[in-house]
Every structure is written in structure tokens, then in C-alpha cells.
Curated annotation (Swiss-Prot):
Protein source organism: Thalassianthus aster
Name of the protein in question: Kappa-thalatoxin-Tas2a
UniProtKB keywords: Cleavage on pair of basic residues, Disulfide bond, Ion channel impairing toxin, Nematocyst, Neurotoxin, Potassium channel impairing toxin, Secreted, Signal, Toxin, Voltage-gated potassium channel impairing toxin
Record propeptide residues: 23-40
Note: This protein is also called kappa-TLTX-Hh1a. The TATX abbreviation is given to this protein, since the abbreviation TLTX was already given to a spider family.
Residues annotated as site: Key residue for binding both Kv1.2/KCNA2 and Kv1.3/KCNA3 (occludes the channel pore like a cork in a bottle): 62
GO MF annotation, one: potassium channel regulator activity
Source superkingdom: Eukaryota
Family membership: Belongs to the sea anemone type 1 potassium channel toxin family. Type 1a subfamily.
GO cellular component: extracellular region; nematocyst
Residues in coiled coil: none
Chain's role: Inhibits voltage-gated potassium channels (Kv) with higher potency for Kv1.1/KCNA1 and Kv1.3/KCNA3 (IC(50)=3.4 nM).
ShKT domain segment(s): 43-75
Signal sequence, renumbered to the chain: 1-22
């Protein structure tokens, strides 16, 4: 009986992970078609001097995985 409960819980968890993954992929496809994917990932060229530090100027990117330039242009 205990084994059946564990198997059922694992099966439900697997099914939920498949559903969530499929929904995320579908949402990304819709965003690519609508152009909102790029709008959401647009970058800024500069950040306020008050927020700049040496480390931030060296490493800061608004979105690491997009085509953005460094954001510390005004430091």
C-alpha cells in the first residue's frame, strides 16, 4: 500500500512537471509571435550615477542572456 502511494505521488509530480514545461514553451512561442518577448528584454544604456559602483560598471548587464550592452554608461 505504501509503495502504491509513493508511486502515485511520483506519477502526479511527473505529470505536473510535463504540463508546466509545455505551458512555458507555449507562452514563449506566443510572446515571440507577438513581439512582446523582445519588448520585455529591452535594455537601458545607462543607469543613474547614484547606483553605480566600480563592480557594477564592470559587470552590470540588465539582462545577461540578451543582446544588451553594459548599463553603466554614465559612471
Amino acid at each position: 500500500m505504501k509503495f502504491q502511494m509513493i508511486a502515485a505521488v511520483l506519477l502526479i509530480a511527473f505529470c505536473l512537471s510535463v504540463v508546466v514545461t509545455a505551458r512555458m514553451e507555449l507562452q514563449d512561442d506566443e510572446e515571440m509571435k507577438n513581439g512582446s518577448f523582445q519588448k520585455r528584454r529591452t535594455c537601458i544604456d545607462t543607469i543613474p550615477k547614484s547606483r553605480c559602483t566600480a563592480f557594477q560598471c564592470k559587470h552590470s548587464m540588465k539582462y545577461r542572456l540578451s543582446f544588451c550592452r553594459k548599463t553603466c554608461g554614465t559612471c
